[in-house]
């Protein structure tokens, strides 16, 4: 990793509350452009909460409060003047369980594009095909684009959700445990997809699977909790260093399987 590292997202002293209950505290880290950053840690340490703060989708879950800064290419996403819809187009999200819409495969991918722009049909067709190819799904569905997305396998549905995110051309893709509901073969396909997308996108992935983190990521952040069960980032670094020579004993205990 000798090339210059450019942060796509800079998180500075971030704390996040659901109502008045603090979920994560004092997190500072960079998510580098065209790199994959894994976020690991035991259940309940704030991994998913953290990743949802990066495009403000956490605000859909109820009243929240945020302290600190999340800088996205030079702009604080919590600035009250920010256009949240535009932000969420630039920072896409793939969730733990596949969530295809109850419509055709084609319309699933076209959905976000239709909302943001009125395009000629030929242009829309091209975007849908490109997104499905980007999600390594085109060859499997090109002859059944008008069939219901609900008829796809779980792994295909997850790649469809990735295609749906890719169609609106985000700069960053957030992935919250994207393989937890998938079988090993479907998981392998998603991991291969992550490898292929890193040249075009910045990716942050939450995973419980430490082997997956070592396979797909360039950088890793280890989260844990304090005595009050508030999530904190313990250590951040190059993935090989985090897993082979962590600096903090808590990280060492976690990656060696002593707790978590």
Swiss-Prot record:
Reaction catalysed by this enzyme: phosphate(out) + ATP + H2O = ADP + 2 phosphate(in) + H(+)
Species classification: Bacteria, Bacillati, Cyanobacteriota, Cyanophyceae, Nostocales
Biological source species: Trichormus variabilis (strain ATCC 29413 / PCC 7937)
Record PANTHER family: ABC TRANSPORTER I FAMILY MEMBER 17, PHOSPHATE IMPORT ATP-BINDING PROTEIN PSTB 3
Protein name per the record: Phosphate import ATP-binding protein PstB 5
Top EC class of this enzyme: translocase
Family to which the UniProt record says this protein belongs: Belongs to the ABC transporter superfamily. Phosphate importer (TC 3.A.1.7) family.
Gene Ontology cellular component annotations, sorted alphabetically: plasma membrane
Subunit structure as annotated in this protein's UniProt entry: The complex is composed of two ATP-binding proteins (PstB), two transmembrane proteins (PstC and PstA) and a solute-binding protein (PstS).
